[in-house]
Amino acid sequence: MYQSLMTVRETQIAIKEVKTFFEDQLAKRLELFRVSAPLFVTKKSGLNDHLNGVERPIEFDMLHSGEELEIVHSLAKWKRFALHEYGYEAGEGLYTNMNAIRRDEELDATHSIYVDQWDWEKIVQKEWRTVDYLQKTVLTIYGIFKDLEDHLFEKYPFLGKYLPEEIVFVTSQELEDKYPELTPKDREHAIAKEHGAVFIIGIGDALRSGEKHDGRAADYDDWKLNGDILFWHPVLQSSFELSSMGIRVDSKSLDEQLTKTGEDFKREYDFHKGILEDVLPLTIGGGIGQSRMCMYFLRKAHIGEVQSSVWPDDLREACKKENIHLF
């Protein structure tokens, strides 16, 4: 039966260790400046992240003006707008401590309706919009993960070390070709188990089979220049997503992707106009789950062991039977 390697109190102390180390290194190595982040945005701005395009944001109106507002799902689009508003230049970027509510999240060991992540975004030049630049950025982030594991091992040697020396890059099409009989999720399990750490490139568009590896909203990632960082989780014995990131859409790719998803109405939103008219800067960015990080590096079996959220009674009871104690 599962046994946590730390008490609740020890876990809380270690969570701070994980977050502080990673935040400092992320800012330093990607040359990012921390900024304040909104909890909600106006609906008409189009700045909310609609994730896979079907999740419902929490909506409410403001008494003063009656304007409709939405709790953010993430800050994928807001960050790009902020870079423009704050006058950042190519090579410069920002990051935020993002908190969000995703009401339609399917709850399980790795998913909660409460989301906390380091949301970051950086301005790039046109010639940087390549797979090579994407991979270079992934390698930088993976280097932080490796150093974090080493740092924790010095303080908590019982946590062990599991990350391989290098992260492997593979496209979603290569995965389908390699494992045609498996579902996309099972392909992730297979490749993560084989290598320990992988980055899957190209998520959102249809593969040769006609199926998508996974859904992605049409208006933030360029589907050819994005991907997910996956590790093999030693406790769960499954693939485990730490980050979704990518080079963002330019006017050409946004135009194509909105047409593919039948979302031409979004062309009238301020944010989308800013991209289509080449007003907003070209960027790369992503979200790195804070609770996901803590869950992986502290070898936890459930995300509720590293964050406070709301869980149905039957789920809490099932966890208790497995010796999993949720915050």
UniProtKB/Swiss-Prot annotation:
Pathway listed: Amino-acid biosynthesis; L-asparagine biosynthesis; L-asparagine from L-aspartate (ammonia route): step 1/1
Bilayer-crossing regions: none
First-level EC class: ligase
UniProt GO cellular component terms: cytosol
The organism's place on the tree of life at top rank: Bacteria
Subcellular location, record wording: Cytoplasm
Keyword annotations of the record: Amino-acid biosynthesis, Asparagine biosynthesis, ATP-binding, Cytoplasm, Ligase, Nucleotide-binding
Primary location recorded for the protein, binned into one broad class: cytoplasm
Membrane as UniProt keyword: no
GO biological process entries: L-asparagine biosynthetic process
GO-annotated molecular function: aspartate-ammonia ligase activity; ATP binding; catalytic activity, acting on a protein; transferase activity
EC number, as in UniProt: 6.3.1.1
Pfam entry (one): AsnA
The keyword Amino-acid biosynthesis is annotated on this UniProt entry: yes
InterPro entries found in the cross-reference section: aa-tRNA-synth_II, aa-tRNA-synth_II/BPL/LPL, AsnA
Entry-linked CDD domains: AsnA
Catalytic activity: L-aspartate + NH4(+) + ATP = L-asparagine + AMP + diphosphate + H(+)
SUPFAM superfamilies: Class II aaRS and biotin synthetases
Protein family membership: Belongs to the class-II aminoacyl-tRNA synthetase family. AsnA subfamily.
NCBIfam families: asnA
Name of the protein in its database record: Aspartate--ammonia ligase
Organismal lineage: Bacteria, Bacillati, Bacillota, Bacilli, Bacillales
